[in-house]
Amino acid sequence: MANTAQARKRVLQNEKRRLHNASLRSRLRTYVKGVLKAVHVGDQEQARSALRAAESVIDKTVGKGVAHRNMAARTKSRLSARVKAMGNAAQ
């Protein structure tokens, strides 16, 4: 238990940050799932627009220090590969 005023304040700040970061991580996962869902359905145009939105959210999450940049690069690469494979399969 925090004994000093400073320690109590830090506990409150950390909890506030934890909740905010959890919200950002959840948003990130939601956008990634949106791309995967569009790919699964086979809607190429929807997948492309979802990919653009997801990449933006991924980059913002990295900029805020919530996600690691390597995870972001890996995720964007895998998502774009799936969307690109959709285009090749359609031709």
Curated annotation (Swiss-Prot):
InterPro entries: Ribosomal_bS20, Ribosomal_bS20_sf. One of its GO terms (cellular component) is cytosol. The keyword rRNA-binding applies. GO terms for biological process: translation. Keywords: Ribonucleoprotein, Ribosomal protein, RNA-binding, rRNA-binding. Belongs to the bacterial ribosomal protein bS20 family. This is Small ribosomal subunit protein bS20. It comes from Acidithiobacillus ferrooxidans (strain ATCC 23270 / DSM 14882 / CIP 104768 / NCIMB 8455) (Ferrobacillus ferrooxidans (strain ATCC 23270)).
